[in-house]
Amino acid sequence: MRLMHLRLIFTCFLTAGLACAQGPRIGTIDFYGLRKVTEAKVRKALAVSEGGVLPSSKADVEERIEKLPGVVEAHLEAACCDDAGKAILYVGIEEKGAAHYNYRPPPTGDAALPAEIVPVYARFLGAVAVASRSGHVAEDLTHGHSLMSDPDVRALQEQFVGFAAKYTDDLRKVIRNGPNEEQRAIAAYVIGYAPRKETVVSDLQYALQDPDDTVRNNAMRSLAAFAVLQRKQPDSEIKISPTWFIEMLNSIIWGDRNNAAVALVTLTDSREETVLEQLRERALPALAEMAGWKHLPHALPAYILQGRACGMKEEALQDAWSKGERMAVIKKLTAAASK
């Protein structure tokens, strides 16, 4: 099953958190990480509801939720947008004893980007914001990197091809030893345009454990595009390990989970048994929870992954989804896996 063109989701593109949402009304609230702690208890501590506005202090709300018994950490993230144009608020918790995704300490080196890359990337972000507001976010990943349909964005992305070829070593050094998280995020995105994708896979997989959310998200976007090219050219030398993506399905950060699930849909397209076994061992509860999210484009990747991991045929998965039987499938697969 194709993931609705497998377009990477632009959630306040290349940024994270509530600040980018600018206080819109909440259309949908969804949760993840709930195992023993109930949704009702988290909702009470959240103290906002559908139809209200996003909380003015993300940190204050997270702190309230973290006071609940059994909650180690909480995280709020707003995504744009539901079918009515309202914000989607994701509330994640990590319970005591639950799976935990570890990040590396911040790098302490002195690597920095070549000066000419930074202003072009800044213009790229601005162009993406304009394109997103007008709904022009379609992109082509078949070259192993993003080329958006919007001509202004695409022209800037095409400059990244030259930068990645010219400055591969510099980008690699910034990812591993750059003290500035913004520069590491830029490097993780631009290096994805390298002409020989197979030579930078290890650098991007290293970035998947960066302590900064945006660095990880950009690395996932780059690797997800590599996976599209790998599927198109199965004899290529591109080899992407699914392990860190699978571990990220248990992350406290919504962007980690969402982008990891999108990438894994491509990486499990061949249904390689060793990868499906990893999903069954490490991520079935997380997948079932994510597959039940109310916003269907966000739920679909996990729904596909849960179905594949549990041996459901692709046609049956697609048929049940189109008939609106998603929740029944999730319940059935979850029950079967628990036996």
Across the structure, where does each feature detected by a protein language model lie?
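Positively charged n-region of N-terminal signal peptides that target proteins for export
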Residues: 1-7
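Bacterial N-terminal signal peptides
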Residues: 7-17
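Periplasmic polypeptide-binding modules associated with outer-membrane biogenesis and secretion
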Residues: 22-35, 44, 48-107
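Extended repeat-based scaffolds of very large eukaryotic assembly and lipid-transport proteins
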Residues: 100-198, 206-209, 213-243, 247-258, ...
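Alpha-helical scaffolds that organize eukaryotic protein assemblies
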Residues: 263-264
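Ordered, soluble secondary-structure elements with a strong preference for glycine-centered loop motifs
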Residues: 52-56, 245, 287
